[in-house]
Amino acid sequence: MWRPVQLCHFHSALLHSRQKPWPSPAVFFRRNVRGLPPRFSSPTPLWRKVLSTAVVGAPLLLGARYVMAEAREKRRMRLVVDGMGRFGRSLKVGLQISLDYWWCTNVVLRGVEENSPGYLEVMSACHQRAADALVAGAISNGGLYVKLGQGLCSFNHLLPPEYTRTLRVLEDRALKRGFQEVDELFLEDFQALPHELFQEFDYQPIAAASLAQVHRAKLHDGTSVAVKVQYIDLRDRFDGDIHTLELLLRLVEVMHPSFGFSWVLQDLKGTLAQELDFENEGRNAERCARELAHFPYVVVPRVHWDKSSKRVLTADFCAGCKVNDVEAIRSQGLAVHDIAEKLIKAFAEQIFYTGFIHSDPHPGNVLVRKGPDGKAELVLLDHGLYQFLEEKDRAALCQLWRAIILRDDAAMRAHAAALGVQDYLLFAEMLMQRPVRLGQLWGSHLLSREEAAYMVDMARERFEAVMAVLRELPRPMLLVLRNINTVRAINVALGAPVDRYFLMAKRAVRGWSRLAGATYRGVYGTSLLRHAKVVWEMLKFEVALRLETLAMRLTALLARALVHLSLVPPAEELYQYLET
């Protein structure tokens, strides 16, 4: 045991045993600093300090902000980052396509004759590369990009076939989201999870579209329903995607002045915004069902409003096959010609009479099923995009169609002018999707080996004139043309079992008669003279229409005979225009 005196002597001995005193901290610091190499002793520039702080501090601050944010704010922060990625991908695709066309037309094909096989082969390959790039970019970006890609399919007489064939894959392809996102959206809109609202809910989507995906579910009363769930980030990214597309279209216009489609995007802004409102879609569906109620074969799924919101739409589940799936249609024992006739009549009723027009009737939105009477029923889906055509425009359109059949140039010019179009012949051909003047066709095109497919050549050679006509039209007419063209394409896919030209023309005149009757009701009354006048006009039109149809069929048969005799080259596109 140490005593206090012994401890003091021990510590004193330790202190006196050191030869040198302990250096002070200041001396130690100065000695080490002086020993550093010169390059490390120079002061750090201010800009480097700021940059280092920003590089290290900014991610830390953003990360902390993200961790502390609520779920909805986290999603918006992710959207900013994802938006930069979408912009980069879109810019890459736009530049790739533009430079590819520039290289082909100005370098590879310089001095090559435009209609030569080599020219057509190179351009076809260029078109295919561009279409593949568009599809890949649209699928990667999703949402609005897929929707616009689907819209391009309807321009199948303005765009090369490589585009329309390739872009059709977008009708059924879109991004699919996980169950966590579905749960998050239901909690935001209903403050409940899907399994709390429904007796059964399948998180695996049965279909995925450009704006939403569809889930199978069952209500508590056992009713099978389809639940359309919007992608949760679409509303937040809508404005950014629109601005990106506007920028890219302007860039393309600078490089290719004749390709001026930015005005189309401007006009579609409002309609696309409407499609994001599923409550509006539900109201559209109910109005469509009311206005087509006199067609017993048209089915519109009933909306369940207590399970719907602006981002969720619940409606009756209706099974069926696509309207262009000929094998599935025949396997049900249904007649293809019956389906084609019903399809044309239903949409012609909207165009020429009600004016409330389904603007996206692609095959994925029209299903076919067997009804109680054993005949086909048409199930109309996706009522988000509708266009209303004013009565004066409907009347002008009906009378223009009638004037085309009667070959009344003065009336054609007058009614086209009422729609704001000056080049009435070109507009008539765009509207009818077939040549208007058979004499002109026969004299200058049918016997020409270079221009056998008249309508295809018209679209390519007069691209700027076609664009001018589209700009002159009332904006609702753009979606009307899309409807007409889509229905025509479905009729072709079914093998053109009915005369679309004949059915549309009859509906146009009937629509004009009903509109005129509503306008002058109480003025002319039901006098015998007025009735006789209506009967005479209808009879005159019926005769002219049947003669026109017969002339078209004879022309197509004669063209095929000339091809068989090797007097003219094959032109399947021409036959389709003459027969469908």
UniProtKB/Swiss-Prot annotation:
It comes from Homo sapiens. This is Uncharacterized aarF domain-containing protein kinase 5. It is found in: Membrane. The lineage of its organism: Eukaryota, Metazoa, Chordata, Craniata, Vertebrata. It is an enzyme of class 2 (transferase). CDD domains: ADCK1-like. The function of this protein is not yet clear. It is not known if it has protein kinase activity and what type of substrate it would phosphorylate (Ser, Thr or Tyr). It is a single-pass membrane protein. The keyword Lipid metabolism does not apply. Residues 179-419 form the Protein kinase domain. Keywords: Kinase, Membrane, Serine/threonine-protein kinase, Transferase, Transmembrane, Transmembrane helix. Its main location: membrane. Belongs to the protein kinase superfamily. ADCK protein kinase family. GO terms for cellular component: membrane; mitochondrion. SUPFAM superfamilies: Protein kinase-like (PK-like) (SSF56112). The chain crosses the membrane at residues 50-67. One of its GO terms (molecular function) is protein serine/threonine kinase activity. InterPro entries: ABC1_dom, ADCK1_dom, Kinase-like_dom_sf, Mito_struct-func_regulator. The keyword Transferase applies. Its EC number is 2.7.11.-. The gene is ADCK5.
